[in-house]
């Protein structure tokens, strides 16, 4: 077993942005990302298309999650179904990363994915 007391102490922060694609899409539409029902789908024109992200409320109240299919989303006027906006997602992710750089050196930020 490793004796961690011999290692230097460091503070590490891990950030995972909650339902990132859905949250960014919701904010862009003027919606509350925590309470709205929103799914980002690979292609809204194809019923078999995969849900890339679902808002927390859509997950909780309708059981729709990443990997679900468009045809599984019930027809409900409260649910927003949108196509991905990759340029927007990349821009927002970049801005958030730049925010981290205000507090820690760039070499200390290790980005795993866009979200």
UniProtKB/Swiss-Prot annotation:
<comment type="similarity">
    <text>Belongs to the DNA polymerase type-Y family.</text>
</comment>
<dbReference type="GO" id="GO:0046872">
    <property type="term" value="F:metal ion binding"/>
</dbReference>
<dbReference type="GO" id="GO:0006281">
    <property type="term" value="P:DNA repair"/>
</dbReference>
<feature type="domain" description="UmuC">
    <location>
        <begin position="12"/>
        <end position="115"/>
    </location>
</feature>
<dbReference type="Pfam" id="PF00817">
    <property type="entry name" value="IMS"/>
</dbReference>
<keyword id="KW-0460">Magnesium</keyword>
<feature type="binding site">
    <location>
        <position position="115"/>
    </location>
    <ligand>
        <name>Mg(2+)</name>
    </ligand>
</feature>
<dbReference type="InterPro" id="IPR001126">
    <property type="entry name" value="UmuC"/>
</dbReference>
<feature type="binding site">
    <location>
        <position position="16"/>
    </location>
    <ligand>
        <name>Mg(2+)</name>
    </ligand>
</feature>
<dbReference type="InterPro" id="IPR043128">
    <property type="entry name" value="Rev_trsase/Diguanyl_cyclase"/>
</dbReference>
<keyword id="KW-0479">Metal-binding</keyword>
<protein>
    <recommendedName>
        <fullName>DNA repair protein homolog YozK</fullName>
    </recommendedName>
</protein>
<dbReference type="InterPro" id="IPR043502">
    <property type="entry name" value="DNA/RNA_pol_sf"/>
</dbReference>
């Amino acid at each position: 077993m490793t004796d961690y007391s011999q290692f230097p102490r460091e503070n590490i922060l891990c950030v995972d942005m909650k339902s990132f694609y859905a949250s960014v899409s919701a904010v862009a539409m003027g919606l509350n990302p925590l309470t709205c029902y929103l799914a980002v789908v690979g292609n809204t024109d194809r019923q078999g298309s995969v849900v890339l992200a679902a808002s927390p409320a859509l997950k909780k109240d309708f059981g729709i999650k990443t990997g679900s299919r468009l045809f599984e989303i019930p027809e409900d006027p409260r649910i927003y179904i949108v196509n991905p906006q990759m340029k927007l997602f990349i821009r927002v992710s970049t801005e958030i990363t730049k925010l981290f750089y205000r507090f820690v050196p760039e070499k200390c930020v290790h980005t795993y994915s866009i979200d």
